[in-house]
């Protein structure tokens, strides 16, 4: 086996664990916190894994084997070297320390040109700005309607279903975007064998994250908020 193939799979596995452990909790953290006392971890894992399978398989089918949804068209595949695999290794250390970081810049910077990184930076700043403004406006509206200091003993099935549906859609949208951070180590057109490897690996990693309760990243999410109201 060529050494570049070893670095390719090592980089993929490190990126898969780092990205899922870091970013997925930022996406599914409130979902996990709000439901962990009502459902066993494997039920939540099954729900998240089902959406993961749908998202990755759809991307693979619709984009001719490209699970990144063609988000890596500006970053052509190149032979993976040790320094490429170093980036997700550093991300893994930061994740284990409970430090939320930008996986996109840390992982893709090892592959992308300065021009591509500049465009990514502009899009990220604009995206974060719009998200922050919209979130703040929504919060202003909601906080005038719901009094979080008041007990709410009545649980309505509608809210539970709405939470699961919205969390599933958010998870699906996140996978469409951030799978590029994992798929950058792999050929742009995957065969069926590599697709199965990707699915099994990511499902097992996601299961470990759910089994451990989300790790340190979930603690940082839960501390300043009241996720049980979500």
Report the location of each language-model feature.
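Single conserved hydrophobic/aromatic residue that forms the stacking wall/gate
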Residues: 219-230
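Transmembrane alpha-helical segments of multi-pass membrane transport proteins and ion-pumping complexes
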Residues: 16-20, 24, 51-63, 87-95, ...
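Interfacial segments of multi-pass membrane proteins
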Residues: 30-37, 108-120
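N-terminal signal-anchor module of multipass membrane proteins
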Residues: 2-60
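Membrane-helix interface "capping/anchor" motifs
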Residues: 92-104
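Structural signature of hydrophobic alpha-helical transmembrane segments
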Residues: 8-16, 70-82, 127-133, 194-200
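Membrane-interface helix termini and inter-helical loops of multi-pass transporters
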Residues: 27, 64-74, 178-190
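Core mid-bundle transmembrane helix pairs that form the ion/substrate translocation pathway
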Residues: 131-132, 143-208
């Amino acid at each position: 086996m060529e050494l570049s193939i070893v670095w390719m799979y090592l980089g993929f596995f490190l990126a898969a664990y780092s990205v899922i452990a870091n970013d997925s909790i930022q996406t599914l953290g409130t979902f996990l916190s709000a439901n962990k006392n009502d459902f066993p971890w494997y039920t939540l894992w099954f729900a998240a894994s089902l959406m993961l399978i749908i998202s990755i398989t759809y991307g693979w089918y619709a984009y001719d084997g490209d699970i990144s949804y063609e988000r890596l068209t500006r970053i052509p595949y190149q032979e993976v070297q040790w320094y490429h695999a170093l980036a997700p290794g550093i991300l893994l250390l930061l994740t284990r320390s409970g430090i939320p970081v930008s996986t996109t810049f840390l992982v893709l910077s090892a592959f992308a040109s300065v021009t591509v990184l500049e465009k990514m930076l502009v899009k990220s700043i604009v995206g974060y700005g719009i998200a922050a403004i919209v979130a703040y406006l929504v919060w202003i509206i909601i906080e005038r309607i719901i009094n979080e200091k008041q007990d709410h003993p009545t649980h309505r099935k509608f809210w539970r279903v709405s939470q699961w549906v919205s969390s599933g859609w958010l998870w699906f949208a996140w996978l469409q975007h951030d799978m590029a951070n994992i798929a950058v180590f792999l050929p742009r057109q995957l065969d069926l064998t590599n697709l199965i490897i990707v699915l099994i690996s990511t499902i097992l990693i996601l299961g470990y994250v759910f089994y451990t309760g989300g790790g340190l990243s979930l603690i940082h999410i839960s501390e300043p908020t009241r996720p049980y109201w979500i």
